Amino acid sequence: MTQQPKIPRATAKRLPIYFRYLTFLHDAGTDRISSAELSDAIKFDAATIRRDFSYFGALGKRGYGYDVKALLDFFANVLDQDSLINVALIGAGNLGQALLNFNFHQSSNMRISAAFDVDETRAGTIMAGVPIYAMSELTEQITAQRINIAILTVPQGVAQEITDKLVEAGIKGILNFTPLRVTVPNNVRVQNVDLTNELQTLVYFIDNYGSITTGL
């Protein structure tokens, strides 16, 4: 992957959405698309799309729009789609098992390659094709499989302790499904996913703003 310019966090969060929809268009045989058409499909305003794309230079042509194949190839490079990314799942309970069954089937370059759990009856088994390891094997497997991203689905009470172990093992990114906002060094990035908070926010918007569609 080539060195990419620094872009705003909000733009970075939209890039996978662009890539997924461009993949759909390419598979459907669509050759080109305008920012207005893209806006209508993914519900981001056209000005936002054009601004996002402008961070990477001239990706389209005035009066023509965007070449779908060229844009897809460009974002595949930006998102490093040619590299297989192994991900560790920490916690093979109900949510963890759901994520194992999902296992990023819509992504061609990411997979959960190892899961870890404190329950000794789960360690040594295979769920949805993924081996479950004991927590004592965490550092060994993360090193052996060159994993630098982990998904955290453990109880809140042990979330920080497990996070510390992940950092010590060399993890650089954590997708945190626990309610706890874990503390990590500056060189480790955490993305928090709080389903309860998201639902409460959704209820608030419905109650106060109706069914207005909003983007990121």
Swiss-Prot record:
Residues where NAD(+) binds: G91, A92, G93, N94, L95, G96
GO cellular component assignments: cytoplasm
Primary localization class, coarse: cytoplasm
Signal peptide (UniProt feature, chain positions): none
Oligomer and partners: Homodimer.
DNA-binding region positions on the chain: 17-56
Pfam families: CoA_binding, Put_DNA-bind_N
Keyword set, alphabetical order: Cytoplasm, DNA-binding, NAD, Repressor, Transcription, Transcription regulation
Lineage start: Bacteria, Bacillati, Bacillota, Bacilli, Lactobacillales
Name assigned to this protein: Redox-sensing transcriptional repressor Rex
Subcellular location: Cytoplasm
Any Gene Ontology biological process: negative regulation of DNA-templated transcription
Family: Belongs to the transcriptional regulatory Rex family.
